[in-house]
Design a protein with these regions (language model features):
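Noncatalytic, beta-rich nucleic-acid-contacting surfaces in large DNA/RNA-processing enzymes
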Residues: 1-169
Length: 169
């Protein structure tokens, strides 16, 4: 998959338990963002969108437009991030050892071949990562570490070195 950017066999995430993780097909979502209700933020009324989840393998990223292209079991989806959010997940985390050598602790989550579970909503032909503080989904982006035979995912929600209480995303 890494060099060809497509699966010549069945997608790795094809047998994920979609009901357990509330994963939807991007094509089944309404192209208009579905507004559930409204809330007030800093004196302005804002729409609260219905959140969906998609999973897929990263095949490309565009640092200028802050987009990531995911290959899902159902097709290709463009995920549009906000600038700060994109930079947070795109950076490589490393530390300098006592002997002066740099050790990579964690690579970018947007490297080709990385599997992600993303929570958000559909806006036209793009998927926008989003979470609400009182939502059942506590993270907008999660790294899929492993998938077992029964479709159960092993997920990583925090970047290495990130505080659990930080609440950035």
């Amino acid at each position: 998959m890494d060099s060809l950017s497509y699966y010549y066999h069945e997608h790795e995430l094809a047998h994920v338990d979609r009901d357990r993780y509330v994963i939807e097909s991007f094509d089944n979502m309404s192209s208009d963002s579905e507004v559930v209700n409204h809330y007030f933020y800093r004196g302005q009324q804002k729409p609260r969108f219905k959140l969906y989840r998609i999973c897929g393998t990263v095949i490309d990223k565009d640092k200028n437009h802050h987009t990531v292209t995911l290959l899902t079991p159902d097709g290709v989806v463009t995920v549009k991030f906000y600038k700060g959010q994109f930079g947070f997940y795109d950076r490589q985390i490393s530390e300098v050892g006592e002997d002066g050598t740099k050790t990579v602790l964690e690579k970018s989550w947007f490297s080709r071949g990385t599997k992600l579970l993303i929570t958000g909503y559909r806006r036209d032909e793009q998927f926008i990562p989003k979470k609400y503080s009182d939502s059942i989904f506590k993270h907008s982006v999660q790294l899929i570490k492993d998938i077992d035979e029964e479709g159960i995912l092993s997920l990583q929600s925090e970047r290495i070195g990130q505080e659990k209480e930080e609440g950035m995303l």
